[in-house]
């Protein structure tokens, strides 16, 4: 039963990888695109060697490629001159995989046991050490850059290599599923939320008011910042939005151009006037 579930995860993760690849290409997220593309390319290794030998190679080099594609400078478009470096990395690792998968010395060195691990039973302790180090690096890097989703995706992508019972089938991962969910959520946020204030935008306001028979609306217009630099004005709007998100309880706040719109659903007029005073 358990093995049949593992077998089914292989094609399921492949489907999510294709979905993540298409979504990231459409949304022009070059980092996620090339990370997922590297996962798809890694599957070719399993056509050249048995599962065990392919796992040894993929468990060491695919996480390295993942980290490399995260830290490389993000390109505006998916395919441009900067992308040639990433394509070259994929070609180089692919050639390396063709050679090392059939290397007895490489497979023997990767299979050596150096210590006992209580919880995990990795296929290779060498690759496991690198996995832990890379995972910790991405968590710290993501916390510093505000991009923790890459650390989460990394952990979900290589769980298979941490447990011996999961090594009997081909490559599967959960990182592509996470990327699909992230891209869908990110698209939703960009459509219905203001970029700077993080408050719902005009589209969200229109959707909110659909079906309302009665409610009170209030508006706060922010003006007098013409002398400020555009960068400083955005910072100020961001701070105002942060204050309103914390202070406006039981009131829905929306950002429409230079105005903050308040929607009072179940409050009477006197309470609404008092809030806006």
PLM segments and residue spans:
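Short catalytic/binding micro-motifs of nucleotide second-messenger systems
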Residues: 247, 277
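Conserved long alpha-helical elements within nucleotide-processing catalytic cores of c-di-GMP signaling
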Residues: 192, 202-216, 224-245, 254-258, ...
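Short, mixed-charge, low-aromatic patches
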Residues: 161-167, 198, 231-237
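Regulatory sensory/coupling modules that transmit signals to nucleotide-handling catalytic cores
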Residues: 1-188
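Transmembrane-cytosolic junction motif
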Residues: 184-202
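Short hydrophobic/aromatic beta-strand micro-patches
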Residues: 263-265
